[in-house]
C-alpha cells in the first residue's frame, strides 16, 4: 500500500535493504546484532534478519523494528522498552505477519483494504494507544513546500530548522545522526561488554526509528 506503509511493508523494506548489503557489511551488522542482543536472547532473533518468520513469530528480528518504530512507539527508548519488555508487542508482530500473508494472497483492491482495516482493529486491541499515536501530529509526513518553486536546499533547510513543524525528513536526520554518535561511543576504550552492548542497542534503536521515517518519505500518501 504505497499510499502509506503498514508494519509488514516497513519490515519488508528494511529486510530487503539489509539483504542487499555487501558480505562484509552484512557480517559487520550481524556482529553488532550479536553484541546488542546480549541478555535478550529469548526476545531477539539469533540472526539480525529472519526471512521467513511464519505467521506466529516468537522472536523479533532487526527488520521488525522498522515496523514497530513510530507506529507502535513514540521514541527509540520507548520502542526498545516495547520490543524487550512487553508481551503485547509479540501479538502485534503476529498480526503484522498475518497481514503480510493476506496482502500477498490477493490483488483485489477491496480485499486488500479490508485486510488492512481488519489488521488496524486487531492492532488497536493489542496496542491500546495505537490510534492515539497516529493522530497526535504530522511527524510521519513531509513538510509542505513554502512555494511551488522551492529549491531542494531551501526545502531541506526548512525541514531541519529549529521550530519547524515535526516532519519525516527532520525525524530521519535527527535519529540517524544520533545512531552514528552512539555507534561511535560503543567503540570507546575502557567500556565493559555490558556498556558496549547498551550503546549498540541504543544505536540500533535510533537507526531503526530513523529508517521508519525514511521509508515514510517515499509513501505517496505522506507527501504534502
Residue ranges and their predicted role:
Residues 213-223:
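Catalytic Zn2+-binding segment of zinc metalloproteases
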Residues 204, 208-214:
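Aromatic-lined, polymer-binding surfaces characteristic
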Residues 3-201, 205, 223-224:
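N-terminal, motif-rich segments that launch catalysis or mediate targeting to/interaction with membranes
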Amino acid at each position: 500500500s504505497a499510499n502509506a506503509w503498514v508494519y509488514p511493508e516497513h519490515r519488508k523494506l528494511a529486510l530487503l535493504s539489509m539483504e542487499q548489503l555487501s558480505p562484509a557489511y552484512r557480517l559487520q551488522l550481524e556482529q553488532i546484532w550479536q553484541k546488542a542482543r546480549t541478555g535478550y536472547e529469548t526476545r531477539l532473533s539469533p540472526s539480525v534478519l529472519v526471512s521467513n518468520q511464519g505467521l506466529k513469530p516468537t522472536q523479533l528480528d532487526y527488520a521488525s523494528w522498522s515496523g514497530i518504530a513510530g507506529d507502535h512507539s513514540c521514541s527509540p527508548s520507548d520502542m526498545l522498552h516495547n520490543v524487550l519488555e512487553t508481551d503485547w508487542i509479540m501479538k502485534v508482530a503476529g498480526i503484522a505477519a498475518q497481514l503480510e500473508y493476506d496482502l500477498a494472497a490477493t490483488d483485489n483492491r477491496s480485499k486488500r483494504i479490508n485486510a488492512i482495516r481488519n489488521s488496524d482493529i486487531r492492532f488497536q486491541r493489542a496496542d491500546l494507544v495505537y490510534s492515539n499515536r497516529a493522530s497526535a501530529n504530522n511527524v510521519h509526513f513531509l513538510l509542505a513546500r513554502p512555494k511551488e518553486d522551492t529549491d531542494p536546499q531551501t526545502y531541506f533547510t526548512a525541514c531541519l530548522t529549529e521550530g519547524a513543524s515535526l516532519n519525516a525528513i527532520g525525524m530521519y536526520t535527527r535519529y540517524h545522526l544520533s545512531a552514528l554518535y552512539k555507534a561511535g561511543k560503543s567503540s570507546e576504550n575502557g567500556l565493559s561488554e555490558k556498556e558496549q552492548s547498551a550503546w549498540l542497542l541504543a544505536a540500533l534503536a535510533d537507526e531503526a526509528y530513523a529508517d521508519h521515517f525514511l521509508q515514510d518519505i517515499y509513501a505517496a500518501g505522506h507527501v504534502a
